[in-house]
Amino acid sequence: HALGEANLAMDSLAEGVQRYSRFWYQLDQLYRKFTYHVRMSGQASLMGSLTEQIENLYSNNYLLKLGDRFQTFVDAASKWEAFPVRKQKEFFEHWVRPFLRKDNKVCVIISDAMRYEIGDELLRLNHSQNVPNDNEKVRQQLVVELDPVLSMLPSYTQLGMAALLPNKE
């Protein structure tokens, strides 16, 4: 089972962010889908033993261990960076401003505490669809990207959302 066998080793904060955004997020995705399907089955009581086992693995073998490993690097950091991962405060200039300079349209989905794995699911849904233009002769090409960013610290809604907007320090 993936939760018990995941190698959660990392040698730096940057490596941890990269490994999460390439591999580990899938564990969160599988867990979310499992809990969703258990609820939707209407048979939650029949799944009780399995649900308890998965909840314990997810909480103790994954979330706790991963959180402890990340915390080690957070505690040791003298400067809050994880190059090449961009900082949250660089979001607008790096991802939005280039579209605006070219007078292109851009849509940004900002959701408080949207998990990376849900962003991945949205990315996959968008890649699987073509959106027809009004005249049906031209198809609009959606460009959808998902990149991790390093959150502001302390991490709370008002500070995080403000960091995404163009402003001076």
Regions found by a protein language model. Give the residues of each.
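…; additionally, a secondary subgroup of soluble metalloenzymes is captured
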Residues: H1-V106, A113-E169
